[in-house]
Amino acid sequence: MGDTTVKAADHISMQIHKGEFVAIVGQSGSGKSTCMNIIGCLDVPTSGTYRLNGLDVGGMDRDELAEIRNEMLGFIFQQYNLLPKLDVLENVEVPLVYAGLPAGERHERAARALERVGLGKKMHNKPSQLSGGQQQRVSIARALAGDPAVILADEPTGALDSHTSREVLGMLQKQIGRASCRERV
């Protein structure tokens, strides 16, 4: 309040290696979201250093951060963040549009990602026509379609039943296995 300075993420030091599955846990207000925003290049640290694949992210401008997000990161949001007027396939294609991929390649990648998460037959449905678990799978497909080196997931199973939660975690583990076979990170 007022002149009080709050350090949301202070004295954090971590190294994450290729193929690792890492969870950031802590009490409410402990800086988890701030930490995730910094890791995801949505924010930069006010002090200290953050390196992603050897790049000093803290010194980058907004355009450079956007390029890093687009090239290296996949996001799975807790609230799905699906666009209601777009169908499932178009929702998965959104980050591929920003990546500058041609329409045919976008469509192919998005369709393949939806098949991987078991939604190949729902490609032309709107998000409102899907269950919560199916919407989460669309969010996962969107993150996977760009074949990112790093996937950041904010409580990806928080609103799901235990069976769907296990399936979602299994999908993420498979992607980690795929990513660790590549020489990108």
What positions do the PLM features span?
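ABC family nucleotide-binding domain
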Residues: 1-182
